[in-house]
């Protein structure tokens, strides 16, 4: 099923960009349903502190369609960064004052703004179609809102600032669901979490956790060997 829409978004500070499922390709329908039904505790055991503490941030979970079908936009953070250095992640970052209300339009604007700043994509070609519950990253104290997007009109992307971003790339969903690329990432602390072997790197941590849950609840997950473990470098 494919919907039809002429909706386009031109970002304006503190104005809520439209969030709509109109015009989505049929294969994204299961992901859109996840956004409307999933509970925070189904995505992660790390939830925002009840005290309200934590730095409000947002990431753009951007789905596109490439030569090998559905794909996700990802980036590798620069190895010199103070937090999450060298990790593969979604585009995103902390909310700025001009993004607006952290409990309303703020995460939507921040996700698009940060994606443009980090990858050079044109936000006008992105259709937002859902928002996942806010989650928490204890090591960096970020309260993160994953914003779901459809790359309706793809634009060139690159690592805009090499001091922050090492590279920008897309990964086919088929590679993420391939059991051969699935693993359990073992942190030196003893923490175990989902991992993906993609683009000659290990995708783990918060980003891997969100992808793992999306694949599961969208019904895209394939059986894989959960006993296969990859130890993380002690610096991770």
Please state what every model-predicted region is:
Residues 1-90, 94-155, 176, 186, ...:
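N-terminal leader/linker segments that precede catalytic domains of diphosphate-processing enzymes
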Residues 160-197:
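NUDIX/MutT-family hydrolases
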